[in-house]
């Protein structure tokens, strides 16, 4: 960990978005309609949308299709770099998630399949 924090959560989210866009095996998993993901931590609040039509940062959201992930910068970093899974961090109470269970499972799958190769086990 540690070294990633220099980049900040925003930079890690940008890298995650780029991975989603370049990993073509993820396309069948992506929803037809946009699903919005909000990351909230002490210093940052970033929202982006994922769908088959693309993945990008957003300013406005459809609250019914929003999944909010809250936690410390370190916990969000651990999720975005693939060191721990979303549900593992929820059990450890490092992250909390608000939104539909279906969207949470979808995002858990995308995080797992899009994690950087150095963390693939």
Whereabouts are the PLM-identified features?
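Feature captures hydrophobic
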Residues: 2-121
């Amino acid at each position: 960990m540690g070294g990633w924090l220099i980049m900040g959560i925003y930079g890690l989210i940008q890298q995650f978005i780029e991975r989603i866009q370049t990993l073509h095996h993820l396309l069948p998993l992506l929803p037809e309609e946009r699903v919005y993901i909000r990351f909230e931590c002490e210093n940052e609040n970033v929202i982006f949308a994922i769908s088959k039509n693309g993945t990008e940062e957003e300013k406005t959201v459809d609250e019914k299709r929003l999944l909010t992930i809250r936690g410390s910068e370190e916990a969000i970093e651990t999720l975005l770099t693939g060191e721990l899974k979303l549900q593992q961090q929820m059990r450890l109470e490092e992250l909390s998630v608000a939104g539909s269970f279906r969207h949470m499972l979808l995002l858990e799958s995308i995080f797992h399949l899009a994690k950087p190769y150095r963390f693939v086990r």
